[in-house]
Curated annotation (Swiss-Prot):
Gene for this chain: valS
Subcellular location field: Cytoplasm
Subunit structure: Monomer.
Free-text comment on this protein's domains from its UniProt entry: ValRS has two distinct active sites: one for aminoacylation and one for editing. The misactivated threonine is translocated from the active site to the editing site.
Family matches, as PROSITE patterns: AA_TRNA_LIGASE_I (PS00178)
Protein name per UniProt: Valine--tRNA ligase
GO BP field: valyl-tRNA aminoacylation
Chain segments annotated as coiled-coil in the UniProt record: 849-873
The UniProt record lists the keyword Ion transport: no
InterPro entries registered for this protein in UniProt: aa-tRNA-synth_I_CS (IPR001412), aa-tRNA-synth_Ia (IPR002300), Anticodon_Ia_Val (IPR033705), M/V/L/I-tRNA-synth_anticd-bd (IPR013155), Rossmann-like_a/b/a_fold (IPR014729), tRNA-bd_arm (IPR010978), tRNAsynth_Ia_anticodon-bd (IPR009080), Val-tRNA_synth_C_sf (IPR037118)
Protein function: Catalyzes the attachment of valine to tRNA(Val). As ValRS can inadvertently accommodate and process structurally similar amino acids such as threonine, to avoid such errors, it has a 'posttransfer' editing activity that hydrolyzes mischarged Thr-tRNA(Val) in a tRNA-dependent manner.
Catalytic activity: tRNA(Val) + L-valine + ATP = L-valyl-tRNA(Val) + AMP + diphosphate
Lineage: Bacteria, Bacillati, Mycoplasmatota, Mollicutes, Acholeplasmatales
Length: 882
């Protein structure tokens, strides 16, 4: 066994060995209970980040522990085609190669996209391997696999037939850069410093030949404030609150869109906030979701003044062809020149940015395919029996379902699931095969989340409900995901599963938080504060990263990355290595069949602690409390096992102190403990525990073992050992407080009225003398010498020390304290005397200040006198003083 822990040597090729020996393969013929986790599919767009590493490691720990409990586990891998993200990445790569997407056919582009997928899928697999994930690659899935694509298109057809899918105009998040609709989860909102532009809309009956900038005239106009003046070309009305007295006379009249001949009405609606801005708002239904709803109530048209790429269209008149922001700049300049402009104010507001292109999102009216969700959500609310961890997220989930809006499921992309809809004029047919040559296939693909919503059951053989995987492993046992996509993904999986399979997709949902830097900022590419998990692994090893990720945040809470804690994780693993090495060097057997009747008190206590620890850990796994499990295991390994038991074990393993029977029994016991500890830690740190386990079991790999059951529980022995520990700890503290040299031996007696305790202590006598650092220790049921005095009491135990020795120690301590206080007081007395004997001080200082110094001097003198009197009396630390 290597002297030092070297994670590179430990982890090198170990995962490949696991794969070659098929350790991760599910066994449908095992006649065991099944446990299944389907991995949340990462986007096939590049490197995994710390969030992926955290999420995957949590699942891996759960899978490995369930396997050690005897379950037939399946951790199913897979990846998401990530429609818009992948298409954008491929476009960037082609651009670097001198190819523009607009010059390529859809077929050629998709050929490049599939090449991209194959390259990056392999990168993700390699990162999974680095993390040590217990994945069965025989069942790996990709959301664009032919069978999954078939399922998706069939589901679309079924939902269309049930009139749950329809086609209509909707205001959607539009990315002008990628020219597609985005889901809400693909939009990042940032506080942005913008402008609020105040613009005049003149009444139609205002004389058009007047000079609008003439201050002598009082023009009749309404003033609005907007952050997006360039959208005014699509305005359909101005709107005021019907209860606002300022604008009652304007309701029903018409105004001109500034610098145009286009007339729009002034309407009233309670939607307008009287106290915000001027109390007048422009209504632009084609470019604002709230205005679109207003338009429905007031029968207004919805027009667009922008093209799909964010440039202005013909409605913008002379600004046609300009980028929206260039148009804004030139339009404001013109409005100022012509008297339509009042002022500009700085305005901090939230602006949506595309997570794909980082372009500012444009709310846009667009013809899209939409899924009705309200009825499905109500069914899900009534029937789902999913357990949420933490429980508080159940309310968030239910509230979302209660207020859910219809879902825009179409995207204007090439890469994705083709919508199986065919058009001929105004006719639409939804089917996979073409109805005939005169029919054209719909240009759109489905939102990535549509296929992801089918992931828990589409990967298990559905819609073939007789498929063995589906029959035996659906619903899956637990979904582990971030709370940030609870509403975007989890909710969709739930209502799709209940609608299509009449079952919940999973039994439990475990939600974790976000990964943040040590300043509390969310890690992201745009902020440049991200950490590559592969770089962490290269420095500290996979096991250290896994331990850090899963023991530093409770379920539902964010994880704050701190490299010093990763280093501490490495230190813990290094400690485990040294512990294992000690056990290996001091044992000459692999047997674990020790005789319980030969165990010492410390061994009985440790075996009881192991039993209780295993029970606690098993219970906590049911609640997915990995942080708490890590805390318990850390304490048990470092404190209970290493700091205490191994110190006693050194005596048990000393051939000069033990008979051969006890020696061999102690060795077997130690090997048993070591194997069990490695098993408990294995789900968290699989590489090092596998390497160490090989030293104690040459037949079975740790990944294939079942966690040993513990039944021995001697609470009396544990209590006695805890009492003994407390005596030892208190003795050490008293040595320290009394400045007793740790090398100074003391004659002690340990007394107890209980014979069983005394017998255990007799067996430990030599070890106790080492711990107490005494010349001689006597174990008795009563004080054997009247000159002994009690020093410490711990429940059923009493510790005695020679009275003379204790007095001497107390006197030494007292003398030290006396001299320290004496020197301090003399120093202060001398300082005060010097000041009070200084003529300059007495002449110049205020009388109050002189008086204060005199009182100080008197106080110091009194304290000094009292100290001398106490010295002449007896030692106050003398325990016999009455």
């Amino acid at each position: 066994m290597q002297t030092k822990y070297d994670f590179k040597k430990v982890e090198h090729q170990r995962y490949q060995q696991w794969l070659e020996k098929k350790y991760f393969c599910a066994n449908p013929n095992a006649n065991k209970k099944t446990f299944t986790v389907v991995i949340p599919p990462p986007n096939v767009t590049g490197k995994l980040h710390l969030g992926h590493a955290w999420n995957n490691t949590i699942q891996d720990i759960i899978i490995r522990f369930k396997k050690m409990q005897g379950f037939d586990v399946l951790f199913l891998p897979g990846m998401d085609h990530a429609g818009i993200a992948t298409q954008n990445k491929v476009k960037e790569q082609l651009k670097q190669e001198g190819l523009l997407t607009k010059t390529l056919s859809k077929e050629i582009f998709l050929k490049y996209a599939w090449q991209w997928k194959e390259e990056h899928a392999q990168n993700i697999r390699q990162q999974w391997q680095v993390l040590g994930l217990h994945l069965d690659y025989n069942f790996e899935k990709f959301t664009l696999d032919p069978d999954l694509s078939q399922q998706v298109q069939e589901v679309f057809g079924k939902l269309f037939q049930k009139k749950l899918i329809y086609r209509d105009y909707k205001i959607i998040n539009w990315d002008p850069e990628t020219k597609t609709a985005l889901s809400n989860v693909e939009v990042n909102y940032h506080e942005t410093e913008g402008k609020l532009y105040y613009i005049k809309y003149f009444l139609v009956d205002f004389p058009t030949n007047s000079n609008l900038s003439d201050a002598s005239l009082v023009p009749s106009f309404l003033e609005i404030a907007t952050t997006r003046p360039e959208t005014m070309f699509a305005d359909q009305a101005l709107m005021v609150n019907p209860n606002d007295p300022r604008y009652q006379s304007f309701i029903g009249k018409k105004v001109f869109i500034p610098d145009t001949n286009i007339q729009i009405p002034v309407i009233s609606d309670n939607y307008v906030d009287i106290n915000f801005g001027t109390g007048v708002v422009k209504v632009t239904p084609g470019h604002d979701i709230n205005d679109f709803e207003v338009a429905k109530r007031h029968q207004l048209k919805a027009l667009l003044c922008m093209n799909e790429d964010g440039t202005m269209n013909d409605l913008a008149l002379q600004y046609q062809g300009l980028d929206r922001f260039v148009c804004r700049q030139k339009l404001v300049q013109t409005l100022k020149q012509k008297g339509f402009f009042t002022k500009t104010e700085n305005h901090l507001h939230k602006v949506g940015y595309s997570s794909i292109s980082d372009a500012i999102i444009e709310p846009r009216l667009s013809l899209q395919w939409v899924l009705k969700t309200k009825a499905i959500a109500q069914i899900a609310l009534k029937t789902n029996k999913i357990n949420f961890f933490p429980l508080r997220f159940e309310n968030i989930f239910n509230n979302w379902l209660q207020n859910i809006e219809d879902w825009c499921i179409s995207r204007q992309l090439w890469w994705g699931h083709q919508i199986p809809a065919w058009h001929k004029g105004q006719e639409i047919k939804v089917q996979i095969e073409s109805p005939g040559p005169e029919w054209s296939l719909d240009c759109d693909v489905l939102d990535t989340w549509f296929s992801s919503a089918l992931w828990p059951f589409s990967t298990l053989g559905w819609p073939n409900c007789n498929a063995p995987l589906f029959q035996n492993r659906f619903p899956t046992d637990v979904l582990v995901t971030g709370y940030d996509i609870l509403t975007f993904w989890v909710s969709k999986m739930v209502f799709q599963s209940i609608l299509l399979t009449h079952k919940d997709p999973f039994k439990d949902v475990l939600l974790h938080g976000l990964v943040r830097d040590n300043k509390g900022q969310k890690m992201s590419k745009s902020k440049g504060n991200g950490v590559d998990p592969l770089e962490v692994v290269a420095k500290y090893g996979t096991d250290a990263l896994r331990w850090f990720l899963t023991t530093n945040a409770a379920p539902g809470f964010d994880l704050f990355y701190d490299e010093t804690k990763v280093a501490s994780s490495w230190n813990f693993i290094n400690k485990l290595w040294n512990i294992s090495r000690f056990v290996k060097l001091n044992t000459s057997t692999l047997d674990t069949d020790f005789d319980i009747n030969l165990l010492t008190l410390t061994q009985k206590a440790l075996l009881t602690q192991l039993h209780l620890t295993t029970q606690k850990v098993t219970t906590l796994y049911q609640k997915y409390e990995l942080k708490e499990i890590g805390k318990i295991l850390y304490h048990f390994v470092w404190e209970d096992f290493a700091n205490w038991h191994l110190e006693f074990a050194k005596h048990d393993l000393d051939q000069n102190n033990s008979n051969l029977t006890n020696l061999h029994n102690s060795q077997k016991f130690l090997v048993y403990m070591m194997k069990h500890i490695l098993q408990l830690l294995h789900p968290f740190i699989p590489f090092v525990t596998d390497a160490l386990y090989e030293n104690f079991d040459n037949k079975t790999n740790i990944t294939q073992t079942t966690l040993q059951k513990t039944s021995y529980c001697n609470l009396d022995a544990l209590a006695d050992f805890e009492n003994l520990k407390n005596l030892i700890i208190k003795t050490r503290h008293l040595r320290q407080e009394s400045n007793i040299n740790c090398k100074l031996n003391l004659e002690l007696e340990v007394a107890s009225q209980f014979s069983t305790i005394l017998q255990d202590f007799v067996n430990l006598q030599q070890a106790l003398e080492k711990f107490f650092k005494t010349l001689q220790i006597k174990i008795t049921n009563k004080v054997t010498n009247s000159k002994k005095t009690i020093w410490l009491i711990e429940k059923n135990l009493s510790l005695y020390i020679d009275r003379k020795t204790l007095n001497e120690l107390n006197e030494t301590k007292f003398e030290s304290n006396f001299l320290q206080q004496k020197n301090t007081l003399l120093k202060e007395i001398k300082r005060s005397e010097t000041i009070l004997n200084n003529p300059s001080f007495l002449q110049k200082a205020a009388s109050a200040k002189i008086e204060i110094e005199k009182k100080k001097y008197e106080s110091y003198c009194k304290q000094y006198k009292k100290l001398l009197e106490s010295k002449n009396n007896s030692n106050p630390l003398n325990p016999n003083k009455k």
